[in-house]
Amino acid sequence: MSNSIEQQQTPEVPPLKYGEREIAKGELFTFPNPRIGRHYQIHITLPEFTCKCPFSGYPDFATIYLTYVPNEKVVELKAIKLYINNYRDLYISHEEAVNQILDDFVAACDPLEVQIKGDYNPRGNVHTVIEVNYQKAN
């Protein structure tokens, strides 16, 4: 028997692809509202939202509808796409996902008003729609 210790080799993890790196950042970037003081709505539809059920691990699919009245900042569209894609591997309930999106959006954009609706694809004959709202205090 030899006194040398065998080293176990762990498989090398391949580097992230450029899209995976961008999604991992997932920050909500904003830019100045070009019409501060004007009350207008922005509607964003994100039809490819995915996350994982925290109980079963099965994937959940939804369309996220975001409608907001900007204050001083507007969300950059590519940034919200990448932010939403960051949920794809998270184990999170429908309710928590939509509420977390609202919290993060309000923190990044400080809108006057925002409504976020998660319309989840039916699974097991159950269709879930989660809707949350925020209105800035005067």
UniProtKB/Swiss-Prot annotation:
The active site is at C53, D60. Its EC number is 1.7.1.13. Its main location: cytoplasm. Keywords: Cytoplasm, NADP, Oxidoreductase, Queuosine biosynthesis. GO terms for molecular function: preQ1 synthase activity. SUPFAM superfamilies: Tetrahydrobiopterin biosynthesis enzymes-like. It catalyses: 7-aminomethyl-7-carbaguanine + 2 NADP(+) = 7-cyano-7-deazaguanine + 2 NADPH + 3 H(+). Substrate binds at V75, E76, L77, H94, E95. One of its GO terms (biological process) is tRNA modification. GO terms for cellular component: cytoplasm. It is found in: Cytoplasm. Pathway: tRNA modification; tRNA-queuosine biosynthesis. InterPro entries: GTP-CH-I_C/QueF (IPR043133), NADPH_dep_7-cyano-7-deazaG_red (IPR050084), QueF (IPR029500), QueF_type1 (IPR016856). It is an enzyme of class 1 (oxidoreductase). Catalyzes the NADPH-dependent reduction of 7-cyano-7-deazaguanine (preQ0) to 7-aminomethyl-7-deazaguanine (preQ1). Belongs to the GTP cyclohydrolase I family. QueF type 1 subfamily. This is NADPH-dependent 7-cyano-7-deazaguanine reductase. It comes from Gloeothece citriformis (strain PCC 7424) (Cyanothece sp. (strain PCC 7424)). The lineage of its organism: Bacteria, Bacillati, Cyanobacteriota, Cyanophyceae, Oscillatoriophycideae. The gene is queF.
